[in-house]
């Protein structure tokens, strides 16, 4: 699982988790 923001870059804040 990777954390992305709304632009698809890897961040931890204000984003979402790729649960794959």
UniProtKB/Swiss-Prot annotation:
Coiled-coil intervals: none
Membrane topology: Multi-pass membrane protein
UniProt subcellular location: Cell outer membrane
One GO process term, biological-process aspect: monoatomic ion transport
Record's keyword annotation contains Nucleotidyltransferase: no
Keyword field: Cell outer membrane, Disulfide bond, Ion transport, Membrane, Porin, Transmembrane, Transmembrane beta strand, Transport
Main location: membrane
One example GO MF annotation: porin activity
Gene Ontology CC annotations of this record: cell outer membrane; pore complex
Entry similarity comment: Belongs to the Gram-negative porin family.
Function: Structural rigidity of the outer membrane of elementary bodies and porin forming, permitting diffusion of solutes through the intracellular reticulate body membrane.
Record note on quaternary structure: Disulfide bond interactions within and between MOMP molecules and other components form high molecular-weight oligomers.
Protein name: Major outer membrane protein
Gene of this entry: ompH
